[in-house]
């Protein structure tokens, strides 16, 4: 995927590590540095590797909310990235007037994509799982190379496997994503954005 085609602040969806598991791809517009250690709901510690790309501003996370596993579908998305503040003066004293957050309006979980999708507010018990990206400068290409943190992939496919099999018109919901996968702007992927 050519990151030069991305619009800063717009959320994109791709499927990884399986053809049925959605992830966000976001260009934050400025470098996203690695942060402090993060902890999964199982107590495992990991360190987010930060942004990639020409400006180190491109990040990717699982688009499956860590609370009740809301995720973007073709018909609706209850989870999305908000680049601009929802209200307020943008000073960041509250998450809703800071902007640059991933917000799940199903139950109100808020994640900070500049800090490894750390939970800022709401009931989510852990950050969104991080997707390892590699930027190949010679080809101007992004590649997903792994997923880490509290991925919740087994729980997701056990709970929603039948639904995603129908939506993707496939029999094997565990089929690995390989080669070139589709990348869609979320507002084109989902017909209705709720948040």
Where are these regions (language model features)?
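N-terminal pre-ligand scaffold of iron-sulfur
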Residues: 1-92, 129-195
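Extracellular/periplasmic metallocenter environments
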Residues: 67, 102-116
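Short linker/helix segments within small regulatory modules
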Residues: 90-99, 123-125
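A conserved acidic, glycine/proline-rich C-terminal tail/linker
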Residues: 118-120
């Amino acid at each position: 995927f050519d990151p030069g085609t991305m619009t800063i602040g717009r959320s994109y969806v791709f499927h990884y590590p399986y053809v049925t598991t959605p992830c966000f791809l976001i260009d934050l517009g400025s470098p996203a540095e690695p942060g402090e250690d993060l902890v999964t709901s199982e107590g495992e510690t990991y360190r987010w590797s930060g942004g990639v790309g020409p400006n180190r501003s491109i990040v990717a996370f699982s688009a499956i909310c860590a609370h009740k596993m809301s995720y973007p579908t073709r018909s609706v998305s209850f989870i999305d990235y908000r680049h601009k503040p929802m209200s307020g003066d943008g000073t960041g004293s509250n998450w809703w007037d800071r902007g640059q957050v991933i917000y799940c309006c199903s139950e109100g979980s808020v994640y900070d994509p500049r800090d490894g999708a750390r939970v800022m507010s709401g009931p989510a018990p852990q950050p969104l799982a991080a997707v390892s990206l590699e930027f190949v400068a010679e080809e101007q290409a992004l590649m997903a190379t792994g997923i880490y943190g509290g991925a919740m992939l087994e729980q997701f496919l056990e709970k929603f496997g039948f639904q995603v099999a129908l939506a993707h018109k496939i029999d094997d919901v565990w089929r690995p994503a390989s080669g070139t996968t589709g990348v869609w702007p979320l507002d084109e992927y989902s017909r209705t954005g709720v948040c």
